[in-house]
């Protein structure tokens, strides 16, 4: 239903179309489907990445990472690494609101959220490969330096993954002002996220054993097999994050603009 406006009110309105959401041009059906597909694909890799970063990284640490280290020392290092991961996860509870505020206050010509898909996807992927290589073999050279650098790398990795995750779910209101369309994006992201998270569980053993056999001649899991797993997951992470970054479009709204102005 259209509402007539006086010429004076029309001149004062920042949106000539009279849409309170601030969206002037509606996307075509093809554009909508493309953006939905791009957004949905994003959480496929994001959830797979998270499973590799949490569940399977611990498996890698406890089974392969310290295989060339003296057994007694390896046991201590495993306990130390797993404890550090738990501490970092707890700290993340308090850090996430700050990261969310940083994302929401980002202002670029590409939008608030898409830049973090690009940056977060790239940085977290590179660092995931690093931790799945034992920091490029440093674990077998100097365990003290390995622990120090591991803490730094894992914290940065976790931060940039969180930036990607926060921006992914936070961008839904910026993609569409329509409540039904938002629910579609949420449902698609949840659905593909389930596929990605559980899918990595299906492929992890074949990937690790196949690449272990290629490089060692044995089907037993090895460093090379887990490194290959890390690289494949990282590539999937970059591909899906960049698909969101380049395949979606943020729409600035009048309400958000007013909120920004009131916050200044």
Features from the language model and the residues they span:
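Membrane-embedded alpha-helical bundles of multi-pass transporters/translocases
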Residues: 2-264
């Amino acid at each position: 239903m259209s509402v007539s406006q006086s010429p004076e009110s029309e001149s004062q309105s920042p949106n000539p179309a009279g849409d309170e959401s601030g969206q002037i041009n509606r996307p075509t059906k093809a554009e909508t489907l493309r953006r939905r597909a791009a957004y949905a694909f994003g959480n496929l890799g994001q959830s797979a990445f998270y499973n590799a970063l949490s569940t399977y990284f611990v498996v890698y640490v406890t089974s392969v990472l310290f295989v060339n280290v003296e057994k007694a020392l390896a046991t201590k290092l495993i306990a130390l690494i797993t404890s550090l991961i738990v501490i970092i996860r707890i700290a993340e509870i308090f850090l996430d609101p700050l990261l969310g505020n940083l994302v929401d206050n980002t202002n670029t010509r590409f939008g608030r959220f898409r830049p973090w898909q690009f940056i977060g996807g790239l940085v977290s992927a590179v660092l995931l490969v690093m931790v799945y290589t034992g920091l490029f073999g440093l674990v077998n050279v100097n365990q003290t330096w390995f622990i120090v650098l591991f803490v730094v790398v894992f914290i940065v990795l976790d931060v940039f993954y969180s930036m990607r995750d926060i921006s992914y779910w936070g961008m839904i209101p910026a993609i569409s002002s329509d409540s039904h369309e938002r629910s579609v994006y949420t449902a698609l992201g949840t659905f593909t996220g389930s596929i990605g998270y559980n899918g990595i569980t299906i492929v992890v053993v074949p990937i690790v054993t196949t690449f272990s056999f290629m490089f060692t001649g044995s089907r037993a899991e090895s460093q090379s097999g887990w490194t290959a797993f890390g690289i494949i997951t990282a590539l999937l992470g970059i591909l899906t994050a960049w698909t969101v970054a380049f395949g979606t479009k943020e729409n600035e709204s009048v309400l958000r603009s007013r909120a920004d102005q009131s916050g200044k």
